[in-house]
């Protein structure tokens, strides 16, 4: 799932490792892979803007950690990277079911969801500069993928919050999840090429493969 395979990674990505590959490793029992996951999620912590700025003004999470962790790449702007990171991290933690690990990354989950929710537009969906296709195809100011990732993270994180005994965040995230589901339907739902489905972004008139994303997060309304 990355150049170098099981020997090394030439770079870490919020999509390739954080979102896609890492949630698999707890099922594998492959210790090197699980250790890699922890190291990978840890490497991104250096790039979470912990300044005193309002969350809306904070820097997005970088897309890639490169050069053995000494530098980064964010040439496509905010691709929904913190949402990708948190999607993979919360699933990884649920699968590991390790209280110490949940505590270890708890502040990162809070940061990511605070950031994501600060990017809600007036229609209640999550804005980002692009998606992992990095503007190879148009994605508008808010795309279906980023909002669906956020929806999934909110549910996963609410479950983890209950494990942590954090009733405040459990309720907040469950409530935000319900609101986001409604917003996804209202903003993205539509008729595309004769199908009652989803527009990938506002104004999208073509069927796109990623309009299946709601199905992957158990939204079966269309």
Language-model segment annotations:
Residues 18, 133-136:
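Intrinsically disordered, low-complexity regions of eukaryotic proteins
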Residues 1, 9, 13, 54-57, ...:
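Catalytic cores of carbohydrate-active enzymes
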């Amino acid at each position: 799932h990355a150049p170098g395979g099981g020997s090394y990674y030439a770079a870490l990505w919020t999509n390739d490792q954080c979102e896609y590959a890492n949630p698999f490793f707890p099922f594998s029992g492959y210790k090197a892979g699980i250790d890699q996951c922890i190291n990978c999620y840890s490497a991104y912590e250096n790039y979470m803007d912990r300044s005193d700025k309002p969350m809306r003004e904070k820097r997005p999470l970088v897309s890639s950690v490169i050069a053995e962790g000494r530098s980064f790449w964010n040439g496509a702007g905010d691709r929904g990277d913190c949402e990708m990171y948190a999607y993979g991290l919360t699933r990884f933690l649920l699968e590991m079911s390790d209280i110490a690990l949940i505590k270890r990354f708890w502040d990162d989950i809070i940061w990511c969801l605070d950031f994501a929710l600060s990017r809600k537009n007036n229609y209640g969906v999550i804005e980002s500069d692009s998606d992992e296709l990095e503007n190879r195809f148009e994605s508008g100011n808010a795309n279906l993928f980023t909002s669906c990732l956020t929806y999934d993270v909110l549910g996963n994180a609410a479950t983890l919050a209950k494990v942590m005994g954090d009733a405040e965040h459990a309720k907040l995230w469950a409530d935000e999840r319900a609101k986001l589901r409604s917003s996804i339907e209202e903003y993205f739902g539509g008729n595309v090429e004769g199908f009652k489905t989803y527009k990938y972004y506002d104004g999208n008139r073509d069927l796109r493969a990623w309009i299946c994303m709601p199905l992957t997060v158990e939204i079966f309304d269309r």
